[in-house]
Amino acid sequence: MASNAALQGEDIPQPQESPPDTACMEAQKWIEQVTGKSFGDRDFRTGLENGILLCELLNAIKPGLVKKINRLPTPIAGLDNITLFLRGCKELGLKESQLFDPGDLQDTANRTTGRTSDCNRKLRNVLVTVYWLGKAANGCSSFSGTNLDLKEFEGLLAQIRKENEEIESPKRSIRDSGYIDCWDSERSDSLSPPRHGRDDSFDSLDSFGSRSQQTPSPDVVLRGSSDGRGSDSESDLPHRRIPDVRKDDMSARRVSFGENKAFVPFNQYLPNKNNQTAYIPAPLRKKKAEREDYRKSWSTATSPLGGERPFRSMSMCDMRYEEEGSMLPHSRAHHEHLQHVNSLLKEEDDTWQDDLARWKTRRRSASQDLIKKEEERKKMERLMSGDSELSDRRKSIKTYREIVEEKERREKELHVAYKNAKTRGEAERILKSYIEKFTISEAVLEGLVMPKILERSQSVEPSLLSSSEDPNPLKYLRQQSLPSPKYTSTVEATVTPSSPCESKSPTGLISPSKNIISKTVPMLTAKPYSQPKNTQEVLKTFKVDGKVNLNGVEEQKGKESGSQTFAAPSLTRSQMFEGVARVDAPVVETKQDVASIKLNLARPNTLNSLHESNSLCEDRNHISQKDEPDSFVQEESVHSVEQLSEGNTQSNSTTQAVPAVSSIEIPPLTVNGKDTEDKRKVEAAELIMHWSLDSNYKEAKKNSLPPLKSSENVEESSKIKENESSHKVQLNITLQTRNAWRRSQFFLQSVDTECTEKSPALVPNLSSPNRSCTWDPEEERKRQEKWQQEQERLLQERYQKEQEKLKEEWEKAQKEVEEEERKYYEEERKIIEDTVVPLTLSPNSNVHFNISERNGNFIPVLPDHAKRDQENNNGQLMAEPNRVIKNEIHMHSNVTQQQILYAHERSMLAAEETQIKGKTEKWEAEPCNHVQSNECNTPTRLTLQAGCKQVMLSESCDLGSPKTPVDENAVHHNMSSIISTRGIDSKEETLNSSQSTSQCQSPNRSVSGKKLCSTCGLPLGKGAAMIIETLSLYFHIQCFKCGLCKGQLGDATTGTDVRIRNGLLNCNDCYVKSRTAGHPTPL
């Protein structure tokens, strides 16, 4: 804005007069009076240059408006103070157009561009601000100083108005499109405050012609340097921010358009109908008749729409008041009228701006709400329509149920794919690909069924299985996933065939006359990383043709052994890895029964469920080893299973081969667990049990007939001797390895070291057929018994430590209880000694004692010998109830016969209660401390408490009912005789009574900081408990049950409604039933 002002200053040079001295002097005088400080020898501008006086002036008008004044003698400090002053003026209500610029007070004497007119203009701006500030101070309630004389500023205002009128004169209207474009381009939005320009107004000069015909409006002239850049320019216009009514024509145009009012236009010197002497554009010079004829021509020349515009709009400048013609343009009435109109316009403009701001805020918030609702609606539509992106993202966030279902589905697909594999390589690839993607568990491995194609290939094409490959693709993978066992196991099995008739009975004798053909039997390793469980005593049994469930239940397919063609015995996955196997081994294309092998492992004698069956097998194996000196051990590789398949089809072999399982030791795992993958593979390979055949059997195999041509059924069974007299009893027993201890603590490190030392690693040589190693069950049993004794010793020590710890805690709790009870009894004793007056009784049975009455008379009490029988029946009575009676009689001297009878009945009841307590005290003296903690909850005490309640009820009923007169002497004699029978000190009896009573009254008192269960009476302990503090009820979680249906109330996961009715816990159902039955609920 400074640039355009400069341009105008160059194009329109105006002589600048100095501001009136009266206004300057009045402003200086007023500032000195208000602030109390003098300008001194400085002039007006120099005195205000540092801004200190201005800030103090503001604080004097409204205290605290300027909080901090910078008093440093630097130009920057002066600018800071002036900025604070202008900000405070805004808070007082002054507008931006009424304030001077911070640079107006700067010293420009040393500048080459400085002119006298420029300095005068800046000084006038400061005086105008002081004028408006004084006007605001006059109306400020917090200001009590001298008021500014506004009349002194009339000369200044008249001078500014005159100069403004000269600039607004039509003679100075410049039709220079270049100047207008230059002014508009320099009017930057970022540097000037936001306001409506002329082009946005209703009466824009575009109505009269194109943009090039615009004239700078007075609004532009008056606000020439409002953007803060015009202060230092050399030729800025002198008419900015004057207190005149014509400086805000924008508001007048906007409001007048909205309300259809014919206001006096602010720009009264612009061309209009009534002002024909002013400059009028060429089209308006036409006559009225000519305008109708040539409307299209000038409309085409001035409007971009050409002839399409049938009419032209009338500017607000063309509308005037009717009486405006009678007013002189420069009259005082006209001036006052304009001021009034301007004030109305200001108020309406402020209201309009507020309404606009509120509307924008409402519109913005409503728009944001609509946008949010629209986004939510679209999101729901995408969800309902199944958008792929959202559905995929939603699928990526799965619940636990979905994860479990997906895992089960994957495992099921693995089972089906593995079972339907056509080749060994395909099955292996299926399993490997699954293990690479997912984690496979033991249950999944156990549930896998060997592909049928592989089972048939082992029986139909045995030559294909004679390679050195592992017949089971799971073996290598299983070995990688399992840790190495840490023990050595040696097993020997003797295999003999049986006759057809004998094989039909499971326990029939096997004929030894058949040629013996050895058959490989897989030796299965244990899984030492599982914990032993007594519930795992049941041995798992697996079949080749059966499906094995996860719980060990076997689904067997019924197979007839007489007329079917059976597959050769093959090793399923479960047989290879689980350690417990059962193999039915029929021979191809025969009608013989299925031969089976039973392999018995001697188990330790610790599990009772396995002890009986294992001991018999151990004895038989031991006898068999003694009677078979020619048995040998020869290790065989894994692919000997295929060699066995070929050997099963051969017939009439004269060589008897008794294969045995060699002793294999698997080295334990390293402690650090940092073995490389190659080492782990080597260790996994050592897990495989190698079986070997006799070399004689191999020679016979070479000379034997081709496979699939033998019709003889080769049956395998364990050769067992029943007794020491060499009587051999052959049993057809199924192959079954009992390996229940594979998860036991037998594989602890201490036992591992011992086993490793006793059983060094054996590396059998296939070329030495005579190499044999016997398995001594006695040595094995001794070693296991020793281990068992060690475990029992450790368990016993642990048990002893736990018992000692519990005993110490129990003793500590008892001590705390005794200390607490001692303190409680001590307090009770002190209270009784302080409140109760002891009675001194005579040992004589005929005691005469007097009860003093308030009137000073004495009532003699005579003994009645007829009441002695009743005394004996009542037993010993404590002194406490009688003292209560004495005190009552002493306090109520004028008692009637009714009250005496009530006292007599109460003493009788107290005697009965004391008798019960005397019996209970003997029971309480027992040495069991834990019984003492529960003595108040015994049936006797509970009955006593209930009886006391009934007595109180009966007493209250007796008070209101009339009684027959009773002999007063008899009553007093009864009382005295009862008291005399107690030849014990009353203090002692009182103490005992208070002790027993206090114990009965507080059954739920804290035991070493722990509450007693309200149901069972035992301490709550450290377990879960339900506590109701407000009712002093405490329950174990197992005791927290309904008193009617006995249902648990504390096991609900979603919360339980518990009602307490008649002292019993009620569940919600029982409570509703009792309410519907009509039982009242006590408060």
Curated annotation (Swiss-Prot):
SMART domains: CH, LIM. GO terms for molecular function: actin binding; metal ion binding; myosin II head/neck binding. The keyword Coiled coil applies. It comes from the Eukaryota. Residues 356-424, 784-835 form a coiled coil. It is found in: Cytoplasm, Cytoskeleton, Stress fiber. Residues 1011-1077 form the LIM zinc-binding domain. InterPro entries: Calponin/LIMCH1, CH_dom, CH_dom_sf, DUF4757, SM22_calponin, Znf_LIM. Its main location: cytoplasm. One of its GO terms (biological process) is actomyosin structure organization. Residues 229-248, 716-725 have a biased composition (Basic and acidic residues). The keyword NAD does not apply. One of its GO terms (cellular component) is cytoplasm. Residues 1-22, 185-248, 291-311, 462-512, 625-661, 698-725, 759-779, 987-1006 are annotated as: Disordered. Residues 462-474 have a biased composition (Low complexity). PROSITE patterns: CH, LIM_DOMAIN_1, LIM_DOMAIN_2. Actin stress fibers-associated protein that activates non-muscle myosin IIa. Through the activation of non-muscle myosin IIa, positively regulates actin stress fibers assembly and stabilizes focal adhesions. It therefore negatively regulates cell spreading and cell migration. This is LIM and calponin homology domains-containing protein 1. The lineage of its organism: Eukaryota, Metazoa, Chordata, Craniata, Vertebrata.
